[in-house]
Amino acid sequence: MAKYLGPKLKLSRREGTDLFLKSGIRAIDSKCKLDQPPGQHNMRKSRFSDYGIQLREKQKVRRIYGILERQFSNYYKRAARIKGNTGENLLKLLESRLDNTVYRMGFGATRAEARQLVSHKSIMVENRIVNIASYQVVPNTVIKIHKKSHKQSRIRASLELSEQQREKLAWIEVDPIKLQGLFKRYPERSELSANIDEHLIIELYSK
């Protein structure tokens, strides 16, 4: 499946919830009618089958984290091989991606912006440049902005906005002065969005 390059808000409307693809830290403006799917107005909403509901949930989570279909399927397979709850394992793998961790630390206003910082070699993991967005971060890992990127205004702006509006995360510690953060541990399920029903995704792949 090819990467989607169309309007970001259209995807949020399709899923009926803010996917934080464009707005990042701030919620989508109330003018964007998330309860109305994209397309012709005043059309009756179609009812989804169980399979359709499961598929929509998978698409929603895949779009939140900006992952292609094959990648997402591989994450599920990895999660299923790990001891414990497969759904929670899946979310932990997604949350510990480098691009997502950079976003969670507030260095990027959106996951797409964080991914760009990674690909442009602006991110260092344990004092080593890593430009692979899917790199898996492990507990007690220090992530910092490369010195050459310290003057990027978008990083400072994102950090300022993050401090003002984003909820503090217990599994991440950030030093905005040094432009670095610590991934202390994997997040617990209770600390992640309740707007995600990973059980539907597991049911979909278990068929």
Swiss-Prot record:
Gene Ontology terms: cellular component: small ribosomal subunit
Residue ranges crossing the lipid bilayer per the database entry: none
InterPro entries (alphabetical): Ribosomal_uS4, Ribosomal_uS4_bac-type, Ribosomal_uS4_CS, Ribosomal_uS4_N, S4_RNA-bd, S4_RNA-bd_sf
Keyword Ribonucleoprotein: yes
Domain S4 RNA-binding: 96-156
Coiled-coil blocks: none
Protein's UniProt keywords contain Kinase: no
Xref: CDD domains: S4
GO biological process per UniProt: ribosomal small subunit biogenesis; translation
GO molecular function annotations of the record: rRNA binding; structural constituent of ribosome
Assigned protein family: Belongs to the universal ribosomal protein uS4 family.
Cited function: One of the primary rRNA binding proteins, it binds directly to 16S rRNA where it nucleates assembly of the body of the 30S subunit.
Assembly description: Part of the 30S ribosomal subunit. Contacts protein S5. The interaction surface between S4 and S5 is involved in control of translational fidelity.
Name recorded for this polypeptide: Small ribosomal subunit protein uS4
Protein species of origin: Blochmanniella pennsylvanica (strain BPEN)
Lineage of the species this protein comes from: Bacteria, Pseudomonadati, Pseudomonadota, Gammaproteobacteria, Enterobacterales
